[in-house]
Amino acid sequence: MKKHLLAAGILLAFASVCFAQPAAQATASPSPKPKPAMSKAQILKTLSAAEKKLWDAFKNKDPKPFKSGLAADAFAISENGIEKKEDTVKMIPTAPCEIKSYELSDWKLTMLSSSTALVTYKGKTDGTCAGKAIPTVWCSTIYANRGGKWLAVFHQETPTK
């Protein structure tokens, strides 16, 4: 029960950050013609490509895509607890994991607002971490469009049964 309350509290705090309105600019300036809104299919294509880039980076132990693809305030929830962006970036090159291949499937996109999206999918990995087979997992990542760039702000994985 405490875990559920903690998770709910974290998600509530996270939602307040994601949905916060930007402060008004002090001086009004003519704004360029706004870009047309992306379709849901375009957003899913963009975010699934971003997820694949991060999975490739994890496989190749390359922290650079995590530095550029995660928001500064990003965090993940894993069996180790809450991990901040800097924890993830530091862990990537030294993770005791060997991944031969992976497959991502069953993609679904839920728009939480015009600039916040939840992408869910299944991740199947042929590999090991600390000598144990990596389980197939259901993944969820929340992205926020900040300054025209989609950045991951939250990630979580749950092993399938």
Residue ranges of each PLM-predicted region?
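Positively charged n-region of N-terminal signal peptides that target proteins for export
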Residues: M1-H4, Q21
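Long, low-complexity, proline- and polar/charged-enriched segments
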Residues: K3-L6, S113
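Bacterial N-terminal signal peptides
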Residues: A7-V17
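A beta-strand edge to alpha-helix "cap/lid" segment located at domain peripheries
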Residues: Q21-S68, D73-K161
